[in-house]
Amino acid sequence: MVVAYKHEPFTDFSVEANKLAFEEGLKKVESYLGQDYPLIIGGEKITTEDKIVSVNPANKEELVGRVSKASRELAEKAMQVADATFQTWRKSKPEMRADILFRAAAIVRRRKHEFSAILVKEAGKPWNEADADTAEAIDFMEYYARQMLKLKDGMPVESRPIEYNRFSYIPLGVGVIISPWNFPFAIMAGMTTAAVVSGNTVLLKPASTTPVVAAKFMEVLEEAGLPAGVVNFVPGNGSEVGDYLVDHPRTRFVSFTGSRDVGIRIYERAAKVNPGQIWLKRVIAEMGGKDTIVVDKEADLELAAKSIVASAFGFSGQKCSACSRAVIHEDVYDHVLNRAVELTKELTVGNPDAKDINMGPVNDQAAFDKVMSYVAIGKEEGKIVSGGEGDDSKGWFIQPTIVADVAEDARLMKEEIFGPVVAFCKAKDFDHALAIANNTEYGLTGAVLSNNRDHIEKAREDFHVGNLYFNRGCTGAIVGYQPFGGFNMSGTDSKAGGPDYLALHMQAKTTSETL
């Protein structure tokens, strides 16, 4: 009997024992910084001369690790291994696959602060953000294991007296997992284990700026008893290895989290039927957002300001769910804006090794340059009332930036920035606010701050996003509680951490026996 699922609790770092335990995790990670990590294909550890170099975005001089880089030849070898392994893995008992996830979750739970410390070093996450990332990785494994146990016997269908009918789920085949750098543990682990527990084999290509945490997760899967060849670790260039695997005729599905442009490119390439291919590939994609917090005139204005600041600047705004637009009723606009500026100026920005840092760096030089270019656009399209400065001398740091008085059709209101920049826009009334919120090609998350029940119900029906929150921020979905995924250009409408997510990695088979 499996106990009911509950999400992994977040660590309270105001408790001295927890603070000391996290500091020990940092020391442990510091003891192995700069190590080399191999590719893993069929259990074989392969070292290549060509390496992906991972550095600390808060301290560019600090080497986190060097990970061997796959070539097309090694990617082909991994595909052949995954394809062969699938023939046995697909017949493994769902209970056994679920047990491996439970064991992996237990291992990560024991090493929780170590994994979070890796995220501090490799992704530049403050303690609370790193802790939440690790907790979510645990949640995905615990939740998907239980979901597989629910789905293992299929779904009931009708049978006449003369027959016995069954509706079962069977795995798809070899999946290519292309995971993101912003949640390099949680999303990577969730995408991988969802595919594996469903009976598929996997080629895992992690983001090139955060491959070390993925290499460490491979150690966990091996310790948990996952057979060799089920997950094959093939870090590499997207243009070389990624394209090759997406195009490969033996690839059955691609699971991707990342930018809109790359997601569209994968979707287009996967749609093409290549020589030797006998199926239509499935694509599971989550591709970002342009997320809005709407503040009604009948709202808790202090809660509104706090929700905007937390959602805009948590992990430096580098969440696909981050608030990049605050649309506020004109009657309360000045009050909410001024309070948000006050709260933003209280935030501490720096190296997240320290406990009390609210905001760390952005991901890399490319991210820094992109965000600063939007800050420059903000100076033209609105008024910068907080932040606006960046410093890339030691790490890639950008001050949390509020741009006020932005027109609803401005670039800052349309284009995904993926950094600590939020645009404030006035709305004439609630209907106007919803119209502005929906005026985007994305549809991932949103929030409405209102004490008007009619307005809440109107937003519930008309605010077109996959995850809509009321009287709170627009980030922080919890596995199994708020299944996550959006509409339109935010992806393929999949819901990670939800009851139908595993079914995306399987196909239904009907059998009918005449009695």
UniProtKB/Swiss-Prot annotation:
Pathway(s) served: Amino-acid degradation; L-proline degradation into L-glutamate; L-glutamate from L-proline: step 2/2
Family matches, as Pfam families: Aldedh
Entry-linked CDD domains: ALDH_PutA-P5CDH-RocA (cd07124)
Disulfide cysteine pairs (residue numbers): none
GO cellular component, one term: cytoplasmic side of plasma membrane
Gene Ontology MF terms: 1-pyrroline-5-carboxylate dehydrogenase activity
EC annotation from Swiss-Prot or TrEMBL: 1.2.1.88
Taxonomy, superkingdom: Bacteria
Catalytic reaction(s) noted: L-glutamate 5-semialdehyde + NAD(+) + H2O = L-glutamate + NADH + 2 H(+)
Active-site residues annotated for this sequence: E286, C320
Enzyme class of the recorded protein, top EC level: oxidoreductase
NCBIfam families recorded: D1pyr5carbox2, PRK03137.1
Family statement drawn from the similarity comment of this UniProt entry: Belongs to the aldehyde dehydrogenase family. RocA subfamily.
Protein name: 1-pyrroline-5-carboxylate dehydrogenase
Species, as recorded: Bacillus mycoides (strain KBAB4) (Bacillus weihenstephanensis)
Lineage of the organism: Bacteria, Bacillati, Bacillota, Bacilli, Bacillales
Protein encoded by which gene: rocA
